[in-house]
């Protein structure tokens, strides 16, 4: 199994907040915590950047990381990522910040150390483009939206 070296920039990680960890052996994502000293209030419709205390340099062009929302925060409180999904390219070097958006109707308070998002490492395949006159015929053809029905 491939391992990625994630640097810890902030002593609060380990001292005050636990290291990111996979919750179960089957977990794909690591939880990212709000590395802040005091609670932050997020009004309805407001966005803010939350530091995670982590820095990353994947350094392997075959890998990237995606930052995803935590389902409970979005469903129960309307707290989602400001950019919906974050993408970290392999050649990025620097701190991880999470853009958080309160799309709910109520004020939401982000507590120090609260799990705000999750990070998943994914394989990368880059496309090569070829100009062609037509595609090879397939059984599906141009069947698009709803082509297979509802039942």
Curated annotation (Swiss-Prot):
It catalyses: dUTP + H2O = dUMP + diphosphate + H(+). One of its GO terms (molecular function) is dUTP diphosphatase activity. InterPro entries: dUTPase, dUTPase-like, dUTPase-like_sf, dUTPase_trimeric. Keywords: Hydrolase, Magnesium, Metal-binding, Nucleotide metabolism. Pathway: Pyrimidine metabolism; dUMP biosynthesis; dUMP from dCTP (dUTP route): step 2/2. Its EC number is 3.6.1.23. Substrate binds at residues 70-72, 83, 87-89, 97. The keyword Magnesium applies. GO terms for biological process: dUMP biosynthetic process; dUTP catabolic process. The keyword Zinc-finger does not apply. NCBIfam families: dut (TIGR00576), PRK00601.1 (NF001862). This enzyme is involved in nucleotide metabolism: it produces dUMP, the immediate precursor of thymidine nucleotides and it decreases the intracellular concentration of dUTP so that uracil cannot be incorporated into DNA. Belongs to the dUTPase family. This is Deoxyuridine 5'-triphosphate nucleotidohydrolase.
